[in-house]
Amino acid sequence: GGAPVLIPVITDLKALTVLVSELDGLVMSGGGDINPLYLHEEPIPQLQDVDTLRDEYDLILLRLAANRQIPIMGICRGHQIMNVAFEGSVYQDIHSQANHALLKHSQTLAREYPSHTVTLEPGMNRLRTIFNGEEQILVNSFHHQAVKEVAPGFRATATAPDGINEAMEHTEKTIFGVQWHPEAMAPQGDEAMKALFAYHIENARRFAKAKAIHQRIVTIDSHTDTPMIFPGEFNIGEKEGGKVNLPFMEEGRIDATFMVAYIPQGKRDEASLQAATAYAIERLNQVKRQQTLHPDRMVIATTPQEIRTIKAQGKKAICLGIENGYALGKLVENL
């Protein structure tokens, strides 16, 4: 089995980043209603107790874990908040908003007993695999909110007889959620619910093996034109899509990258060559400047051993380079 780690309900990004980086898997548990402001909606009268601190905490955890490819399992509210995090929608109250007849989704039976069926979607999906190809299973039910429109990148994998979503999975990442509470049924010997947790734990075990490989080897991005993409002064400590930077390297466990000055071939007259050399030097100096901005996160490396030493220090190694020899001009000494 897996060893549970309780994460305190805090919203300090640095603290949660450190905690999540040590995890092999994440379970998003049940709880109260989700604040509709996160859905860009006003609260309806049927909305029950919300905890905005918990919402913010859950959303941060989900983003941190998903960006690091950590396997995630959502349960009930965890299933719903996962959908919110990835820009799906949620019913504030299914009974007043679904606009059709519904089952009883808040059972009065004891939690370990199932109260209705769910139908698993046909085709290849994780739930069908976990439940050995079964088309229908029995689940318990304790909710009045539910996934409405499944988030982009996800697909629905189970539905209640009244059409309410009961499960979904990401089409690429190892992320899935269920609306019911398998943690209440598994201890009573329900083999199907045990299989859900076994599946998640196996995913976490594989992720732990992948992390161990990254700890043992040096992972290098051998070429990036980042210095040429950023105009003027830039800051690789800030996360910006489409550009290699420290946050992306940390999330992806990249130990080192070569940041190069790429100068396209131009005229060979003295003035043009000097301009190319000067521009390459300016770009590489901007890379060197990053070390003064982020001395606790990166170091400029010039040898393989320096890369290994920097990795052992928990920092990222940045190597300098040029692409195309135009910046050298006619002087090999410019190397």
Describe each model-derived feature in a short phrase.
Residues 68-70, 316:
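A short helix->loop->beta-strand "cap" motif at the edges of active sites that frequently abuts
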Residues 31-34:
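Short glycine-rich anion-binding loops that position phosphate/pyrophosphate groups of nucleotides
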Residues 39-56:
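A short, gly/pro- and small-residue-rich
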Residues 209-335:
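N-terminal hydrophobic targeting/anchoring segments and the immediately downstream early-domain regions
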Residues 76, 143, 181, 223-225:
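Histidine-centered divalent metal-coordination motifs
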Residues 2-24, 28, 51-68, 95-211:
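Amide-donor transfer/coupling interface in amidating biosynthetic enzymes
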